[in-house]
């Protein structure tokens, strides 16, 4: 049963072929079987999940219509609020914080009869690309337990990859959905800025953050977008981009023209380059024309991103001061000590590094030198993408410059930041982008193809991702490999 997609599970529960209670019990058994190896979750809510499943089964027995996610288990990244569960952001600062409300996306999932299984591990406050910066425990890649799952939504990607849940929610500020999706061999979608409400998401960088789904198929990503995309009066940045459903737009039609920034791809490892261009050859075989596009300005994207994201993070995290809520140092006896010790003891090293960088670039002496210049370059990146889209419908890039690396292999922060080279620009430019599994590296690890569209063209991006998935027979390719893994094998 754990190999079923969300669509298949919802259909089976709606038709009475499966019960929501049976589905929920099955996935908790799966979690109990392998979670000790993977470490995808921070907290589980088995009792509440089974109560919700029972209500769904009773609803069906009364002949009432069920929602789009009838009985579908969902994992939630632990920076998204769920009533009754702690929102820790994988930080000691919020270790005991329990929100009094649901995030809008969670509210909409519950309304469609989805079942929340628990909260998923992440890099602290979503700052990182390994999920090793969690204050609680690391998460391991289900394809190779000695390797990272990516981050910051590493728990979400690992949970979907290990089949602990068919779908999960993550957040993407600079690649935090797409990179772990590629590392763990699943589909990850970063919607356009404003396409999904951020109400109930603990902010990292408010002009960059976006909630999105991770799943084993593009169809399930489309299903989740149908459930929770759209305008929300509680989030002034949210917009109503879509008139029709995502599911109705899925087809195997290929785009007429795909743009490729070839000069930006120099230096790729041979097997990564070969996989990327062989993926594009599948589109060419179906009639797509590839054109070169000029996006050399993206070589500055990582620098610009870390200036702007850190500045916004420093501002957003200023509220965690030990006064109103969150961790309060027992050693503090004065107001000054309360601020200094609570934050110094509560935040991890990476979060403190970003806060320091953010406060530095926002200081009176440095704001013009760094922050304002970075804002100006961001505007140029937005313009460069607009120019590129005049030549093509869709852009394509790799998701990452390497497959998942070993835990402890990369320790230098700057080297880790450079892992984001192919993902941060889409956040800076507010664009939708999907990571779809595309094959395997020379080590046998998953790789991903990234498909990018114009802001508001999320449905086209998902449709092209679906087209690639079907023409490349990705589901069949990856299902053959699952059985060979200790974590991914077992009884169905």
Swiss-Prot record:
Its EC number is 6.3.5.7. GO terms for molecular function: ATP binding; glutaminyl-tRNA synthase (glutamine-hydrolyzing) activity. SUPFAM superfamilies: Amidase signature (AS) enzymes. GO terms for cellular component: glutamyl-tRNA(Gln) amidotransferase complex. Keywords: ATP-binding, Ligase, Nucleotide-binding, Protein biosynthesis. Belongs to the amidase family. GatA subfamily. Heterotrimer of A, B and C subunits. PANTHER family: GLUTAMYL-TRNA(GLN) AMIDOTRANSFERASE SUBUNIT A (PTHR11895:SF151), TRANSAMIDASE (PTHR11895). Allows the formation of correctly charged Gln-tRNA(Gln) through the transamidation of misacylated Glu-tRNA(Gln) in organisms which lack glutaminyl-tRNA synthetase. The reaction takes place in the presence of glutamine and ATP through an activated gamma-phospho-Glu-tRNA(Gln). This is Glutamyl-tRNA(Gln) amidotransferase subunit A. The gene is gatA.
